[in-house]
Design a protein with these regions (language model features):
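Hydrophobic ligand-binding cavity/cleft-lining segments
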Residues: 1-44
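Short acidic/polar mixed-charge low-complexity motifs
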Residues: 2, 58-60, 88, 103
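Hydrophobic/aromatic beta-strand elements that line small-molecule binding cavities or substrate pockets
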Residues: 6-8, 62-68, 91-98
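Plant-biased detector of terminal regions, especially N-terminal secretory signal peptides
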Residues: 8, 24-25, 107, 144-146
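A generic beta-sheet turn/junction motif
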Residues: 10, 57, 100-102
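A short, structured loop/turn motif at beta-sheet edges
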Residues: 14-15, 68-73, 96-106
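Glycine-rich portal/gate segments that line the openings of hydrophobic small-molecule binding cavities
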Residues: 29, 38-86, 134, 138-146
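Beta-strand/loop substructures that line and gate deep hydrophobic ligand-binding cavities in soluble
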Residues: 81-134
C-alpha cells in the first residue's frame, strides 16, 4: 500500500491554521488545484460522514467523505469515494501540532491507498508534490506571518 507523507512548518499558531482547514468545504480557499466545492445534502461541513464534491481547475471531479475531525488534536481524516486518479481505499489525514518555541505549527498530511504497483511511485509523487505541498504553501501565504 503506497504512502504519501508531506510535512511543513507554518509561521502561524496551530489554532489560526486550524480555522482554515477545519471547514471540510473550504478547499477552494487554500488548495490551489480546487475550483469549487459543495457539501452534498446541505450537511454541516463538520459533520462526520458528510461528503464534499469538488471540481479541479484542470478538470475532473472528486467526492470525499469526512471520517474524523478533532478540534482537540487539530486533525481531519477523509476518504476518497470517487476520483479521476487510479486509486482505491484512499484515506488521508491532515494534522497540525503547535511548535513550542514560537507562534508556529508543524503540519503533516499523510495518505495511504491501493493502486496498480506500476503506478505507485508516480501517484505518491503527484499527490505529495501536486496536492499536499501546494496546500501547505497556500496556507503559509494566507495565514503565515508576513
Amino acid at each position: 500500500m503506497p504512502k504519501v507523507y508531506v510535512s511543513s512548518v507554518i509561521d502561524a499558531p496551530a489554532e489560526r491554521v486550524w480555522r482554515e482547514v477545519r471547514d471540510f468545504n473550504a478547499l477552494p480557499r487554500w488548495l490551489p488545484a480546487v475550483a469549487d466545492s459543495r457539501i452534498e445534502g446541505d450537511a454541516p461541513p463538520d459533520q462526520i460522514g458528510c461528503v464534499r464534491a469538488f471540481t479541479l481547475k484542470a478538470g475532473g471531479a472528486l467526492r470525499e467523505k469526512l471520517l474524523a475531525l478533532s478540534d482537540f488534536d487539530y486533525s481531519v481524516c477523509y476518504a476518497i469515494l470517487e476520483s479521476p486518479m487510479p486509486v482505491s481505499n484512499y484515506v488521508a489525514t491532515l494534522r497540525l501540532a503547535p511548535v513550542t518555541d514560537g507562534e508556529r505549527c508543524f503540519a503533516e498530511w499523510t495518505a495511504e491507498f491501493d493502486c496498480e504497483p506500476s503506478r505507485a511511485e508516480e501517484l505518491v509523487e503527484r499527490i505529495g508534490r501536486g496536492v499536499f505541498q501546494p496546500g501547505f504553501d497556500e496556507l503559509k501565504r494566507r495565514v503565515g506571518r508576513r
